[in-house]
Structure formats: structure tokens, C-alpha cells
């Protein structure tokens, strides 16, 4: 991944757009539709590189998945008819694919090997392996912490598990494994984390009880699964880049339609409101996965903010671009309790600070977050996504604060979650 992209976009940004389907929900919809015997339609899925890795793996297990315009048609023989794969299951750059399938394949008892790219090979897997081994999963990694993960058949038992980190991926790995146990599993969370697995289990007829910080599964829950059609809302993590772009670019007025606003994911909306940003939600729908249209207008004199506690997991993937937003506030902002950023595609505490500081902004990395001072774009250094899609898009948004073009190395990383990101940003420039 060595592509360079020159970003030359100026404001104001004006217009109405949709963003690609939610990445987290697309992964889970493919997994659940594949487990269920019969046909499921997944509408407006995200077909970035990460979700394609998930699709490819289920095809190897014997599931027929067809792309049909803006939907996926999943025809599955059901989990009981899955084939043993006779090759390594390649997860690419996808932590979601790797960690959730570690649980799912352990539960299924299918002999398999999960392995990803160089970035995935550096990301910790012990947080998933520990609870799975407590469930009697036969799963091993390099140094008990890294891919490749080798899975062998076993009989999964239920556990009572106190989460060590607020991680939806760890929680979901346990939940997927627990589907195949004839015991009850109880998970106690530290903080609220995204709950798409729980809401989508119900959508596919799998019984599950969820209170605020406690989740309980039913014995032999997999036997209840049924195929279902699912409409994937727009990804709020992708919408975040346009929300921030409109807030920091004079005279901008942007509306994003059909964005998922699940309360476990909508931290960026809470943060923008606390900072005094001009943001309005309308056309709201309710249901398992609520949606809204979001209108954002340029807002000078944003108020500084401290982001900590339960707000952090609700905005974890958006924190790099939120850090950029905080540079435009009238005082110093702080992000705390965000150690989870260290184990993303890159250490996002360091990469966010390093890349924005190169451009003249003033950010100090801390052990669990960032201190962000009011600062401006001062120098047109060449920056680098470091193969992290969210860093690449954040830097493209930062370029709106420069009067000169900005060169970003390894920009094609954005295709992981948002193919067509740059043309969509340019569309708003042209409509302005």
C-alpha cells in the first residue's frame, strides 16, 4: 500500500449525501445470514475490503453469497452443513472478522486457521482467547496473543464472564461462541459498548437478554436462528468525517441521510452538542437499529470538551477526527480513558498526534488519550495514513483547514471502510 493522494478540496461544503452502510452491522448480518438455513437479503451493505473478507470466508464454508445491485443475497445450507475449509481463512485488515470468527468457529467446532495481514498480526488477540479458553474452546495463537489462530473441534461450555475492557469485539466473540453451548452464558460489562450483536441476534430470532451492563444467553440458542432480511443503516463512523468537515469549514451546510444512531454508537453527536456545534437530527426512525438524517452547519467558537468515561466507547472509532475538531475549539480539550485506541489498526493515540502535529496542530499524547490545544494548520508536510483508514480520512478532512493541497501517503487504506470517500467529499465542494 504505497499510493499517494493529493487532496485539494476547499469549502464551503454544501449538499445532501448518504454514507456507506455500517461496517459493524454488515459483518454481523453476513455472519448471521450465513448461519441460518435459507435465504436472507442484506440491503445497502458496506462492500469495503473488511466486509469482503468476511464474505469470502463464509463462501469457503459453503455459503452462496451474491452481490445484486445494492444488496447481498445470502443462500445458506445452514451452519450444520458448513464444510471444513482446506485453506487458511484470510481476514485481511479486519479485526472484526478475526475476533468474531474466533468465537464463531470455536463454537462451531470447525477445524480452521484464521490469519490476516501484517497489521492484524500485530493486534492483540489474548483478550479474545482468554474467555474462549474459559469456555473450553480449543484455540491457540502465536504466544497466546497473535494470529494466526488455530481452531480445533471442542464442546463449548457456558461461563459467567466479567469483561476486562469495554470492547464490543470481545463481547461478540463470546456471544457467537455461546450460541453453540447447551449452558447459559452471562457477560458483565465494564461500560456500555456497541450492542449490534445483541440487537441483530434478536433480528435473526436468537433469544438473548440484555440489561444495561449484563447480557445473558439461552442454552442451545443457535437452534432458534432463522433467515431474515436486514436493511443496513449508514455508518455513523463514516458520517463523522463529514460532520467534522462541515463544522470546521466556513459557510458549510451538509445533510447526511439514513445514518445509524444506535445510542451505543452516537457519541459523536453527544460530543458535538456539548461543544456547541450546529447539528440537527430529523427524519428519525425507531427500531432495533434507529436512523436519522443529520444536518450540520459551520460553527465557529466551538467550546472545549473533556471526553471520558462511558462517552469513550460510544465514540471510539471517531476519536481521531474528533481530535481534529477539538483543535478548532476556543480552549484546551482532553480525551481520557481511551487506551483502546492503542490496539486499533495503528496506535491511534500516537498516529493522530504525530500526523496532526506534522501539519502544525498542537496535540500531546498521553497514556490513555490526548491533550488538544487550540491550533491551526501551519505547514504542508506530507503525511501518511500508516495504512489506517480512519487516519487517512481524518487527514483529508484536516486539509480543508489549509489553503494549499495536502499530500497523503498510503491513502488507499480508506477503501477498508469507505470506497468512494474522496469523490463524495468533492461532490459537496462542487455543490457548494
Curated annotation (Swiss-Prot):
Catalytic activity from the UniProt record:
3-phosphoshikimate + phosphoenolpyruvate = 5-O-(1-carboxyvinyl)-3-phosphoshikimate + phosphate
Q: Indicate where this protein is primarily found.
A: cytoplasm
In the record, biological process GO terms are: amino acid biosynthetic process; aromatic amino acid family biosynthetic process; chorismate biosynthetic process
The metabolic or biological pathway listed in the UniProt record of this protein is: Metabolic intermediate biosynthesis; chorismate biosynthesis; chorismate from D-erythrose 4-phosphate and phosphoenolpyruvate: step 6/7
Recorded family membership: Belongs to the EPSP synthase family.
Subunit info? Answer: Monomer.
As for what it does, the entry says:
Catalyzes the transfer of the enolpyruvyl moiety of phosphoenolpyruvate (PEP) to the 5-hydroxyl of shikimate-3-phosphate (S3P) to produce enolpyruvyl shikimate-3-phosphate and inorganic phosphate.
Q: State the name under which the record lists this protein.
A: 3-phosphoshikimate 1-carboxyvinyltransferase
Organism from which the protein derives:
Staphylococcus aureus (strain Mu3 / ATCC 700698)
Amino acid at each position: 500500500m504505497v499510493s499517494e493522494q493529493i487532496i485539494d478540496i476547499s469549502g464551503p461544503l454544501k449538499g445532501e449525501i448518504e454514507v456507506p452502510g455500517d461496517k459493524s452491522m454488515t459483518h454481523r448480518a453476513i455472519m448471521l445470514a450465513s448461519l441460518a438455513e435459507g435465504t436472507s437479503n442484506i440491503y445497502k451493505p458496506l462492500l469495503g475490503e473488511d466486509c469482503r473478507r468476511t464474505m469470502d470466508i463464509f463462501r469457503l464454508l459453503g455459503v452462496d453469497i451474491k452481490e445484486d445491485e445494492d444488496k447481498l443475497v445470502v443462500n445458506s445450507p445452514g451452519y450444520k452443513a458448513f464444510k471444513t475449509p482446506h485453506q487458511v481463512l484470510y481476514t485481511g485488515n479486519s479485526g472484526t472478522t478475526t475476533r468474531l470468527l474466533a468465537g464463531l468457529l470455536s463454537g462451531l467446532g470447525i477445524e480452521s486457521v484464521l490469519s490476516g495481514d501484517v497489521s492484524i498480526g500485530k493486534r492483540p488477540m489474548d483478550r479474545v482467547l482468554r474467555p474462549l479458553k474459559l469456555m473450553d474452546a480449543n484455540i491457540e495463537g502465536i504466544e497466546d496473543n497473535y494470529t494466526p489462530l488455530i481452531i480445533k473441534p471442542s464442546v463449548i461450555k457456558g461461563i459467567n464472564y466479567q469483561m476486562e475492557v469495554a470492547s464490543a469485539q470481545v463481547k461478540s466473540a463470546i456471544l457467537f461462541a455461546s450460541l453453540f453451548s447447551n449452558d447459559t452464558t452471562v457477560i458483565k460489562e465494564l461500560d456500555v459498548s456497541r450492542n449490534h450483536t445483541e440487537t441483530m441476534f434478536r433480528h435473526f430470532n436468537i433469544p438473548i437478554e440484555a440489561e444495561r451492563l449484563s447480557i445473558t444467553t439461552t442454552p442451545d440458542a443457535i437452534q432458534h436462528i432463522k433467515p431474515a432480511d436486514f436493511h443496513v443503516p449508514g455508518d455513523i463512523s463514516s458520517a463523522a468525517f463529514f460532520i467534522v468537515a462541515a463544522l470546521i469549514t466556513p459557510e458549510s451546510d451538509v445533510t447526511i441521510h439514513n445514518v445509524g444512531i444506535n445510542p451505543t454508537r452516537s457519541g459523536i453527536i453527544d460530543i458535538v452538542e456539548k461543544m456547541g456545534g450546529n447539528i440537527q437530527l430529523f427524519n428519525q426512525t425507531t427500531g432495533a437499529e434507529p436512523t436519522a438524517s443529520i444536518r450540520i452547519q459551520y460553527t465557529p467558537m466551538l467550546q472545549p470538551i473533556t471526553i471520558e468515561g462511558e462517552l469513550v466507547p460510544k465514540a471510539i472509532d471517531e476519536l481521531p477526527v474528533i481530535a481534529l475538531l477539538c483543535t478548532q475549539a476556543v480552549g484546551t480539550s482532553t480525551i481520557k480513558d481511551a487506551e483502546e485506541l492503542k490496539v486499533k489498526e495503528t496506535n491511534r493515540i500516537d498516529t493522530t498526534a504525530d500526523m496532526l502535529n506534522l501539519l502544525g496542530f498542537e496535540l500531546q499524547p498521553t497514556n490513555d488519550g490526548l491533550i488538544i490545544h487550540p491550533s491551526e494548520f501551519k505547514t504542508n508536510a506530507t503525511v501518511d495514513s500508516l495504512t489506517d483508514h480512519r487516519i487517512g480520512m481524518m487527514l483529508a478532512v484536516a486539509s480543508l483547514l489549509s489553503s494549499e493541497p495536502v499530500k497523503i501517503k498510503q491513502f488507499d487504506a480508506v477503501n477498508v471502510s469507505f470506497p468512494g470517500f474522496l469523490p463524495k467529499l468533492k461532490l459537496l465542494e462542487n455543490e457548494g
